């Protein structure tokens, strides 16, 4: 799962990124509403953590706009605005939860988990490709009824490939899914994790699309 963090306070942003990674989530971070909207258009996210005091636009206006565009992913507002009126306004415009700064990281983690569970229960919580089943709420993967033990990076790669099963995924998209896990990623980071993932799901199942990226197929015979 991948989280989009929209926060213009650099110090807090770094802390939020670290907190997300510690919990096993990949994340992208932006500092303006415009950049956030561009990220939503270009990527696939499971949740947005949104500050309201953005430099280019009020976060409530941004939230209202993305809801009008039919983005249904859960949004957690993270803000210093602490009045009842502020909270009601945020929830009414489309937020799924509202957390006031300062906050405890444990509470933030719990609220994110609750939002993801709720969202997954409302829609498709499982991805199924051949005999592979990925439960997005539990972050578990089974192959032929047997649970696979994956690292967080392997899980991030497999979930992306399963979402686009049968279609090639560009290596840059896959690289971005795991980039945040490494402070100084090497040039072969992606290849190493693809190799390890192939050992677990079947070598011929993840195919190299020369000059582009990788593609997951339903079984090794396809």
Curated annotation (Swiss-Prot):
Residues in Response regulatory domain copies: 2-116
Protein location: Cytoplasm
Effect caused by changing residue 144 to S: In strain: ECOR 44, ECOR 48, ECOR 50, ECOR 51, ECOR 52, ECOR 53, ECOR 54, ECOR 55, ECOR 56, ECOR 57, ECOR 59, ECOR 60, ECOR 61, ECOR 62, ECOR 63, ECOR 64 and ECOR 72
Record InterPro entries: CheY-like_superfamily, OmpR/PhoB-type_DNA-bd, Sig_transdc_resp-reg_C-effctor, Sig_transdc_resp-reg_receiver, WalR-like, WH-like_DNA-bd_sf
Disulfide bond residue pairs: none
This protein's UniProt keywords: Activator, Antibiotic resistance, Cytoplasm, DNA-binding, Phosphoprotein, Transcription, Transcription regulation, Two-component regulatory system
Induction (UniProt): The eptA-basRS operon is positively autoregulated by BasR under high iron or aluminum concentration conditions.
Pfam families reported for this sequence: Response_reg (PF00072), Trans_reg_C (PF00486)
Gene Ontology cellular component list: cytosol; protein-DNA complex
DNA-binding region: 124-218
Domain of life: Bacteria
Molecular function GO terms recorded: phosphorelay response regulator activity; transcription cis-regulatory region binding
Family annotation (CDD domains): REC_OmpR_PmrA-like (cd17624), trans_reg_C (cd00383)
Post-translational modification: Phosphorylated by BasS.
Gene Ontology biological process: phosphorelay signal transduction system; regulation of DNA-templated transcription; response to antibiotic; response to iron(III) ion
Modified residues (4-aspartylphosphate): 51
Impact reported for residue 214 to F: In strain: ECOR 27
Additional note from the record: The activity of the BasR protein is in some natural isolates, but not in strain K12, controlled at a post-transcriptional level by the PmrD protein under low Mg(2+) concentration conditions.
Physiological role: Member of the two-component regulatory system BasS/BasR. BasR induces the transcription of the ugd, ais, arnBCADTEF and eptA-basRS loci, all involved in resistance to polymyxin.
The protein's assembly and partners: Homodimer.
Protein name: Transcriptional regulatory protein BasR
Organism: Escherichia coli (strain K12)
Lineage: Bacteria, Pseudomonadati, Pseudomonadota, Gammaproteobacteria, Enterobacterales
């Amino acid at each position: 799962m991948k989280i989009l963090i929209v926060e213009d306070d650099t110090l807090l942003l770094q802390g939020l990124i670290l907190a997300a990674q510690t919990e096993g989530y990949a994340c992208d971070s932006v500092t303006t509403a415009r950049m956030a909207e561009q990220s939503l258009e270009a990527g696939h996210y499971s949740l947005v953590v949104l500050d309201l005091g953005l430099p280019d636009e009020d976060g409530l206006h941004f939230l209202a706009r993305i809801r009008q565009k039919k983005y249904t992913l859960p949004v957690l507002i993270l803000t210093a605005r602490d009045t009842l009126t502020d909270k009601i306004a945020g929830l009414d415009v489309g937020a799924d939860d509202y957390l006031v700064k300062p906050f405890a990281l444990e509470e933030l983690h719990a609220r994110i988990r609750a939002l993801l569970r709720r969202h997954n229960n409302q829609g498709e919580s499982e991805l199924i490709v051949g005999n592979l089943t990925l439960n997005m709420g539990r972050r578990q993967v089974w192959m032929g009824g047997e649970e696979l033990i994956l690292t967080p990076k392997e899980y991030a790669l497999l979930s992306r490939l399963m979402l686009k099963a049968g279609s090639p995924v560009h290596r840059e998209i896959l690289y971005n899914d795991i980039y945040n896990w490494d402070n100084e990623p090497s040039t072969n980071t992606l290849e190493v994790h693809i190799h390890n993932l192939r050992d677990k799901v079947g070598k011929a199942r993840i195919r190299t699309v020369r000059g582009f990226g990788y593609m997951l197929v339903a079984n090794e015979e396809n």
